[in-house]
Design a protein with these regions (language model features):
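Non-catalytic cap/lid and distal C-terminal segments of serine-dependent acyl enzymes
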Residues: 1-275
Length: 275
């Protein structure tokens, strides 16, 4: 583990760290906010997965989440959105390759050697976090857009790992979206039954979910037609999930939207983490 930076923030520390990952075959970077309570013992954890084109920095510097996490005594983790470095496959587009992993474990070349992001988040990152004063029995997850897709699918697939899940503007039904179909074929191959294991709507339909769910979606989101929020809401209703799906009038897909409602999400997770 290498320390890249540490800065005092809302009485705690905002750090940036790098570590070796067996899953991605390279060095990964993440941000970690530790509230001041961490000086006295382990604190609960909220992981934030960012969206397309992002790094670990975007939510760390734009969401304002640290202020509300400090009030609740919760740590925040900001992972990167893909592997990086020499030899890591990429495309010219913004929606596949670097910063566009869709948080899946790729099975197809040229992606397979490094794009093992589900394993990275659920194994390697968790192992790295064990070096810090964190209560790894109390972990929740959130995310935005592609990261919202990642948060929902990882929570649905690993229900014992996360106590609650939330998302801003998530890609809710990627197997039925331009944001998902091409990427899944590239990363996972042409077998659509494999795709279903990475689709929040289909996972909710098939498995249900017994932990709290919160989704915020802006009505002025310029990518609304790609996100299929209604499909996920219907799946939650059919599964009788403990889910709040909120449409926020006039809000778009930007970090201004996230900053407007991040306090609600931190409070939502605090209820589950301290239950």
């Amino acid at each position: 583990m290498d320390t890249i930076s540490e800065n005092k923030c809302f009485g705690g520390t905002q750090g940036v760290y790098s570590h070796a990952s067996a899953a991605t075959g390279g060095t990964m970077t993440f941000g970690l906010f530790l509230p001041e309570e961490a000086a006295n013992g382990p604190v609960p954890v909220l992981i934030y997965l960012s969206g397309l084109t992002c790094t670990h920095e975007n939510a760390m510097t734009k969401s304002g989440a640290q202020a509300f996490a400090a009030e609740q005594g919760i740590a925040l983790v900001f992972p990167d959105t893909s592997p990086r470095g020499d030899g890591v496959a990429d495309t010219d587009g913004f929606d596949m390759g670097l910063a566009a992993s869709f948080y899946v474990d790729a099975t197809q070349d040229p992606w397979k050697p490094h794009y093992q992001m589900e394993t990275y988040i659920t194994r390697d990152l968790m192992q790295a976090l064990a070096d810090f004063p964190l209560d790894m029995d109390r972990v929740s997850i959130t995310g935005h857009s592609m990261g919202g897709h990642g948060a929902l699918t990882l929570a649905l697939k690993h229900p014992d790992m996360f106590r609650s899940v939330s998302a801003f503007s998530p890609i809710c039904h990627p197997t039925a979206s331009d944001w998902g179909q091409r990427q899944f074929e590239g990363y996972l191959g042409s077998d659509k039954s494999v795709w279903a294991d990475h689709d929040a709507t289909l996972l909710m339909r098939s498995n249900g979910y017994d932990k709290p769910v919160l989704v915020d979606q802006g009505t002025a989101d310029q990518f609304y037609d790609k996100l299929n929020t209604g499909d996920f809401a219907a799946a939650c209703a059919d599964a009788r999930a403990d889910a709040q799906i909120r449409l926020q009038s006039g809000y778009d897909h930007s970090y201004f939207f996230i900053a407007s409602f991040i306090a609600d999400h931190v409070d939502f997770h605090a209820q589950a983490l301290y239950a």
